[in-house]
């Protein structure tokens, strides 16, 4: 089949020739951790997790992801230890098993997992819709507008 519109958080797709895009939201990033492995009781900050492994999904853009995680942690005064894993599921399982923490976004399904908690971070990433340039369907523009309003009001 042919997709009319794709929802993505992948920034590289926005630069593909023949693709149009619209940002619909900025998703807040969070630091996901296992409550059983919290560094201490009470109020936590990202700095409290400086000794943890930061699990990230490895791939061809591993340098980009590593730099991204480092830039997210820099305002908190530390450089994270990065531990690549092969998939998002492996990253979540790693957090669940106490192997480290993960930077994800506020829409992650893992946030509702019993035994997990998260800290809001001073960082966001864009959620975008993309479609082929040849699709000049006004319904796509209307969909973008409706989706932006829906997300904003959620």
Set out the residue ranges of the language-model regions.
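Conserved glycosyltransferase catalytic-site signature
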Residues: 66-67, 87-89
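Short beta-strand-centered segments that line the small-molecule binding cleft or hinge
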Residues: 1-29, 33, 91, 96-99, ...
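A generic "structured core" feature
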Residues: 80, 98-106
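Short beta-strand-to-loop elements that line the ligand-binding cleft
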Residues: 78-87
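Secondary-structure junction motif
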Residues: 52-76, 141
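Flexible hinge/capping segments at coil-to-helix
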Residues: 16-54, 138-141
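A late-sequence structural motif
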Residues: 117-154
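Short secondary-structure boundary segments
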Residues: 9-12, 35, 105-108, 133
């Amino acid at each position: 089949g042919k997709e009319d519109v794709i929802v993505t958080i992948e920034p590289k797709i926005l630069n593909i020739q023949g693709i149009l895009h619209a940002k619909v939201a900025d998703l807040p990033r969070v630091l996901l951790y296992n409550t059983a492995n919290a560094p201490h009781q009470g109020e936590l900050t990202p700095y409290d997790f400086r000794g943890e492994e930061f699990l990230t999904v490895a791939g061809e853009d591993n340098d980009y992801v590593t730099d991204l995680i480092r830039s997210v942690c820099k305002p908190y005064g530390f450089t994270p230890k990065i531990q690549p894993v092969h998939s998002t599921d492996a990253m979540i399982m790693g957090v669940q098993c106490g192997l480290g923490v993960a930077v994800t976004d506020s829409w992650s399904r893992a946030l509702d997992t019993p035994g997990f908690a998260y800290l809001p971070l001073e960082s966001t990433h864009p959620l975008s819709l993309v479609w082929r340039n040849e699709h000049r369907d006004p319904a796509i523009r209307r969909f973008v507008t409706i989706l932006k309003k829906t997300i904003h009001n959620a």
